[in-house]
Amino acid sequence: GYICLNYDTEAVDGENLSVPTSLEDVTGPEWRGKVALPSPVSSSPGRGFMLASLDYFDWQSDDGLKFSDWWSSMVANDVVITSGWTEAYETHYTGGYGEWTEGYIGDAHITVSYCHSPGVESYYNGNWTKSASLDIPKTSFFQVEYASAVSGGNALYAQKFIEYLISPEVNSMM
């Protein structure tokens, strides 16, 4: 699915923060230390968001902020870079279900997640969520996830596992 920025609507309202309408907005002082991004090195949503930021800033555009300038501004603005999606969403993000998990820190009101994460939050939380997707043009990335049996000595079990992954039983839980 699509990867995008998600934000905590209650925190934004409660702290009187402006809802970002551009990537430049989250480099401002009101968002200092309140953004958690999964590392593009170890996280596929992190990689997807990094690619979206490349597109957003037109890679090496001569007019205005460059992609690398934005990332440097985020570092200077105390962005929390995590080891992966789980740490960003469950440990740092205030708008998700992480607040009910062990190790929760809750210091970030914006994170990278799937654009459908707020819907999933609502589904499992009695049709209510405080999380929303940010609709900032050119900041989303479509990620395809797949499974494959490429080589090895257990082709039969690999095939059975893939059949299980695509079964109605598994997909009804997603």
What is each stretch, according to the model?
Residues 24-27, 109, 123-141, 150-152:
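Short beta-strand->loop
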Residues 24-27, 50-54, 71, 159-166, ...:
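Non-transmembrane alpha-helical segments in soluble domains
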Residues 52-134:
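Ligand-binding pocket segment of bilobal, Venus flytrap-like solute-binding proteins
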Residues 6-11, 54-55, 143-157, 173-174:
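A bilobed periplasmic-binding-protein/Venus flytrap-type ligand-binding module shared by bacterial periplasmic
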Residues 3-6, 34-38, 109-114, 133-135, ...:
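Structural recognition of the beta-strand scaffold that forms the well-ordered cores
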Residues 1, 31, 49, 107, ...:
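Residues that flank catalytic or metal-binding motifs in active/ligand-binding sites
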Residues 1-41:
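A conserved helix-loop-strand patch within extracytoplasmic ligand-binding domains
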Residues 33-42, 164-174:
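Periplasmic-binding protein-like
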